[in-house]
């Protein structure tokens, strides 16, 4: 009995304890569950707050970066705010700010040549303005990254880091840099081609550049009428190979041209490489076959009557070589020289250059829509045109007369138009007209500047230059001449040249070299303008000068060009090789005598 009662009591006690334990566990579980629910809600609320703060911070940072980027890029492109233009129509001013931008460029304001940025971006002449792309930043799931709950596409990939961070557009290579790199690559490729062509198939032997035996193969056929008829080396002792491939440039590989073309191109090669030649050689006339190669033996102009002025140089190889040389030359002397026809304005410029200008032979027309006010001004212009002495005093009197007679914007425009038309129609007057425009640049009537009207006229003719070339060649050449003279003479208030004119001038000079209508006149105009403004143009934009001189070399080496064209282009190339410094008197005399004989 006692045992059974004790067992029942212990079982009741155990069951009561187990019930208490179960109730305690349920109680603890309920609290734990409540705490877990509250904790999750708190974590989620805090996470959302952090995400919102992060997103707002990123958005603000992105906006600030965009503002800085837009501001820096706008001024890095060289454009100033429109408030800098002080003229009344927002397309005219100048001297107060010296801000220029041509409407041939893609500018934001559509300004004319009379607006210039502090740093003109010449690359706008070739490309469009690139705008900075604005990409929103993706949302960053901080909670997912921290708890290992990252889903595909929600995180940041190092490969796509530029999608997250703001992209700086200011250091990307510009298109003009790619063009320059491509041009350099082409130059290197052409140089390698020339070097490969100069290597003989059997190794470098002196016989290739020296003696040409009559019994040799194809090489002898190419050079059988070289400078000594194939009997001896070059009179000047220099190799006769050229550095340009005519087969590649002009497709003359079929041997249908005269066999002296290779000697001709070789002499041009020697002329390009030996700029500093001894003065006695430079004094020789164009009939000297040992000179720099302006006149190849295959041309009818090869032996001009310069042999009568000086004794014939002794040729290597003895009297036999000299007799052979004379036998080769005499039939060519009997040929008639092709006549070179130049425009009257080109002849006038040549006479002025050669100090043979006749000041009384050209009559200047005097047409004025307002005779009462313009007669005196036209008279002063005619005096300056016919008599180039004491120009400064005449310029001063013209300015005083213009200030006294100009009382309206229309009258100022008439004065500018009169000077412009006279300078364009008479190229010999272009330099004097440019000096006059430089002195009157600050002249202003009713808020309109003299310089603004002048540049607007230049810009207008530049836009229609193709029609001008087809309709009136004289006016086309006169416009280019006056444009270059204005660039070389006029200066801003800070003493800087008008950089907005650089690209238009390069364009016009390139078109002169490519002209097929009046070749000699166009090349003469290009040559004389490069001699006067070449240094300044190269300082402003050397890459385009390199391209222009490459075109000049190609044209000079083209067999179809005349002797006058080659002489003018060679003089420019030699002047550039001398860093645009004046050539020595013997070299200058040589070119002057050559031009006189070729244009006689």
Curated annotation (Swiss-Prot):
Q: Origin organism of this chain?
A: Mus musculus (Mouse)
* Assigned keywords, A-Z: Acetylation, Cytoplasm, Nonsense-mediated mRNA decay, Phosphoprotein, Translation regulation
What is the annotated role of this protein in its UniProt record? Specifically required for the pioneer round of mRNA translation mediated by the cap-binding complex (CBC), that takes place during or right after mRNA export via the nuclear pore complex (NPC). Acts via its interaction with the NCBP1/CBP80 component of the CBC complex and recruits the 40S small subunit of the ribosome via eIF3. In contrast, it is not involved in steady state translation, that takes place when the CBC complex is replaced by cytoplasmic cap-binding protein eIF4E.
SMART domains cross-referenced by the UniProt entry = MIF4G
Q: What is its main location?
A: cytoplasm
Q: Which residues carry this modification: N-acetylmethionine?
A: 1
Q: Name one GO biological process term.
A: regulation of translational initiation
Quote the gene name from the UniProt entry.
Ctif
Subunit organization? Interacts with NCBP1/CBP80; the interaction is direct. Associates with the eukaryotic translation initiation factor 3 (eIF-3) complex.
Q: What is this protein called?
A: CBP80/20-dependent translation initiation factor
Q: Where in the cell is it found?
A: Cytoplasm, Perinuclear region
